[in-house]
Amino acid sequence: MLYDRFGRPVTNLRISLTQECNYRCFFCHREGQRFLAKNELTPEEIERLVRIASRLGIRKVKLTGGEPTVREDILEIVKRIKPYVIDLSMTTNGSRLKELAKPLAKAGLDRVNVSLHSLKPEVYKRITGVDGLEAVLEGIEEAVKYLSPVKLNMTVMKGLNDGEIWDMVEFAAKTGTILQLIELEAPREMAETAFFRKYFYPLKPVEEKLEKLAVETKERRMHRRKKYFIPTDYGIAEVEVVRAMHNTVFCANCTRLRVTSDGKFKTCLLRNNDLIDFLSAMRNGASDEEIVEIFKRAVLMREPYWK
């Protein structure tokens, strides 16, 4: 297993498969990738990377984007990398889950996170730029059958969907999904912009209310986040709160190494001066051991953003 200079183990790989997306969410951080990548990793290159990572103790992989399901070879990618990992998941907008949930599960995907920022069609369209709520809800229904546990990612934004938090808690209970309430996040230089101030909605008061309502709480090892079990008319809802801004505990317990869609290691979502190219080495005939050394160099560059 690899450890960074701060004693944090690296156990998770978060791979952006593409920067292409069929949605236009106005707040999207694009996994920290600022520019559209035209040189995407091939399925063979992704498989090789994950195989090497598994030798280093990295056995959990999350596929992201952009929107990973817009890649026509998504099933091949999943099938290729599953033998090397114990937990293979994906973050998706859910637009193609109705047709893909079962094939993805058959290919080896274990579970999904679905971005669901509103249950109101007009608000959903305003946030995502797409009139696609109904298709996503149908996709979630299919995902629950084949890719459980399904997590719903709701980025809470002031004046847009902050009034839907408790409706979403009930929806999670009703559908048997797990709700993640997520604060808007941004690098330091963006946190004082008019955009951020307009939409940032602090979740601390919400978490305090969840604490009071919960019939049970647990703590996740990842980021030391609490899980709240909330009684509703539809049964118990499982709710997590992601508050990354200025959260030193969140960063101190990060175990992720990110991979950009154009073949670079990225040590932190909020940094852009930390990219380490491995794809050029791969395509120029580098051995597995040489890729391992690039892995190690990337891990040693990791440091908590908030500390």
From Swiss-Prot:
GO terms for molecular function: 4 iron, 4 sulfur cluster binding; cyclic pyranopterin monophosphate synthase activity; GTP 3',8'-cyclase activity; GTP binding; metal ion binding; S-adenosyl-L-methionine binding. Its EC number is 4.1.99.22. Keywords: 4Fe-4S, GTP-binding, Iron, Iron-sulfur, Lyase, Metal-binding, Molybdenum cofactor biosynthesis, Nucleotide-binding, S-adenosyl-L-methionine. Residues 5-231 form the Radical SAM core domain. GTP binds at R14, K62, T91, K151, R256, L257, R258. GO terms for biological process: Mo-molybdopterin cofactor biosynthetic process. [4Fe-4S] cluster 1 binds at C21, C25, C28. Binds 2 [4Fe-4S] clusters. Binds 1 [4Fe-4S] cluster coordinated with 3 cysteines and an exchangeable S-adenosyl-L-methionine and 1 [4Fe-4S] cluster coordinated with 3 cysteines and the GTP-derived substrate. Belongs to the radical SAM superfamily. MoaA family. This is Probable GTP 3',8-cyclase. It comes from Thermococcus kodakarensis (strain ATCC BAA-918 / JCM 12380 / KOD1) (Pyrococcus kodakaraensis (strain KOD1)). The gene is moaA.
